Amino acid sequence: KQAEQAAGLMVVSNNIERIADRCDEVDGLYKKILDNGQLLSDAAIADLTACMDMTEKLFGESMNAIITGDSETPDKVAADKKKIRKLQRQAGKAHLARVKKNTCVRSLTADYSALLYSMDRMADNCISIAEEAIDDFTFDKLDIENMDSDSEVMVKAGAQA
């Protein structure tokens, strides 16, 4: 049981780390845009914000599935992932339409697409987290009162670190 718990925790941890990496990518891309003296249009920012808000919702749902052990949440997360993909496709098409109308800069197309792609990958990681709930992985709470003294010392030492 402990080995399964450890493996599940590693999967969740790995996916959270990947989400953090994608956040760094988004931050780096946006800084690159600003460093080049360019700005995203208000419409582009609104589209990206909608995608990021949905991704944030997905992350919350995924973590809730792990915390509660709700095995139905992964299906909800997968449905929301489809909504994110639809938002991202719409955002990409809207960007190209703005480029045609000269309300967005063509040179930002690659960076804008990369921003959308990073959010898509975050959503994939959220699904992987939620799927751990299907495997009955949940964060067990430690019962400190019933632990032996060595375990209690380790828990207290960890809490002080």
Explain the meaning of each model-derived region.
Residues 1-161:
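Cytosolic, long alpha-helical scaffolding segments
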